[in-house]
Amino acid sequence: MRKRQQSQNEGTQAVSQAPGNQRPNNTCCFCWCCCCSCSCLTVRNEERGDSSGRSPHTTKMESIQVLEECQNPTADEVLSWSQNFDKMMKTPAGRNLFREFLRTEYSEENLLFWLACEDLKKEQNKKAVEEKARMIYEDYISILSPKEVSLDSRVREVINRSLLDPSPHMYEDAQLQIYTLMHRDSFPRFLNSQIYKAFVESTTSCTSES
């Protein structure tokens, strides 16, 4: 009986020490993850979204709007964002981090809409302009869309008239209105968020270590 118990204990220890049961170390750095496709923040926010019971809505344009490729910003650059919203919005790393914050507030569609408008303004092909303009309307302007952005009636009327002959700049008024909303409403909370503070800390530590 004693030998049988001893052999069972040894078998249990062997299973618990097997390589397949060991948890791999997560070596993904916070400051790297903001700019790469394996964003830790994205994973964490998706987990929070699943646990909250809120079903995510994926739109046509959002499927295109993945995190932008960018270089890791310096600590000085990250700190400068707190003084200048325009400067942050001009950098891919800044937009990526701001987008992660907006996702926690369920207002990511504001930035996605702004990015889609920026993309439309670069388009020169008439058919492509018409297609992108229609997709933007369906995803962010239509009252039937789960990603509808908040616009006043005047701007909506301008957009509806422009749909008859779409142009690359047809959403400029709406884009400015959403940009102003993000600047005045979301940006102050972003600067006080744990997402921004942790990113500042991580970039500062990365700079000091190098």
UniProtKB/Swiss-Prot annotation:
Disordered: annotated segments = 1-21
Q: Spell out the GO cellular component terms annotated for this protein, sorted alphabetically and separated by semicolons.
A: cytoplasm; membrane; neuron projection; nucleus; synapse
Described purpose of this protein according to its UniProt entry: Regulates G protein-coupled receptor signaling cascades, including signaling via muscarinic acetylcholine receptor CHRM2 and dopamine receptor DRD2. Inhibits signal transduction by increasing the GTPase activity of G protein alpha subunits, thereby driving them into their inactive GDP-bound form. Binds selectively to GNAZ and GNAI2 subunits, accelerates their GTPase activity and regulates their signaling activities. Negatively regulates mu-opioid receptor-mediated activation of the G-proteins.
State the organism of origin: Mus musculus (Mouse)
Origin superkingdom: Eukaryota
Q: How does it assemble?
A: Interacts with GNAI1 and GNAQ. Interacts with GNAZ and GNAI2. Interacts with OPRM1. Forms a complex with mu-opioid receptors and G(alpha)z/i2 subunits, including GNAZ and GNAI2; the formation of this complex results in mu-opioid receptor desensitization. Interacts with HINT1.
**Where is the secretion signal located?**
none
PROSITE patterns (UniProt xref) = RGS (PS50132)
In its keyword annotation, does this UniProt entry include Ubl conjugation? yes
A GO biological process held by the record: negative regulation of signal transduction
Give one Pfam family, short name only. RGS
Q: Which GO terms describe its molecular function?
A: GTPase activator activity
| Annotated ranges, domain RGS | 84-200
Q: Know the name of this protein?
A: Regulator of G-protein signaling 17
Which cellular compartments is it found in?
Answer: Membrane; Synapse, Synaptosome; Nucleus; Cytoplasm
Report the residues modified as Phosphotyrosine: Y137
Expression sites (tissue/organ) = Detected in brain (at protein level). Highly expressed in the hypothalamus, periaqueductal gray matter, and pons-medulla. Lower levels in the thalamus, cortex and spinal cord. Weak expression in the striatum and cerebellum.
Recorded hits in InterPro entries, A to Z, give:
RGS, RGS_sf, RGS_subdomain_2
Q: Which controlled-vocabulary keywords does the entry list?
A: Cytoplasm, Glycoprotein, GTPase activation, Membrane, Nucleus, Phosphoprotein, Signal transduction inhibitor, Synapse, Synaptosome, Ubl conjugation
PTM per Swiss-Prot/TrEMBL: N- and O-glycosylated in synapsomal membranes. Serine phosphorylated in synapsomal membranes.
Q: Which Gene3D superfamilies does its entry note?
A: Regulator of G-protein Signalling 4, domain 2
